[in-house]
Amino acid sequence: MKTIELITIFAMITTLMVTVVAGDPIDPKVLESLVGK
């Protein structure tokens, strides 16, 4: 389970990093879905 959790966290961070680099505004719904999970 810990491995899956690490992959999920890594994916979340990567997504946020790409979003920031792309300069696109972060969708509140996306943040809510990430926090919800």
From Swiss-Prot:
Keyword annotations from UniProtKB, A to Z: Amidation, Secreted, Signal, Toxin
Positions where Valine amide occurs in the chain: V35
Keyword Secreted: yes
Signal peptide: 1-23
Domain of life of the source: Eukaryota
Location within or outside the cell: Secreted
Residues annotated as transmembrane: none
Keyword Signal part of the UniProt annotation: yes
GO-annotated biological processes: venom-mediated perturbation of blood coagulation
Biological role: Toxin that induces mild paralysis, and reduces survival and reproduction when injected into aphids (A.pisum). May affect various processes in the aphid, including wound healing and hemolymph coagulation. It does not increase the sensitivity of the aphids to the chemical insecticides imidacloprid, methomyl and Spirotetramat. Has no insecticidal activity when injected into blowfly (L.caesar). Does not display any antibacterial or antifungal activity.
Name used for this protein in its record: U12-myrmicitoxin-Mri1a
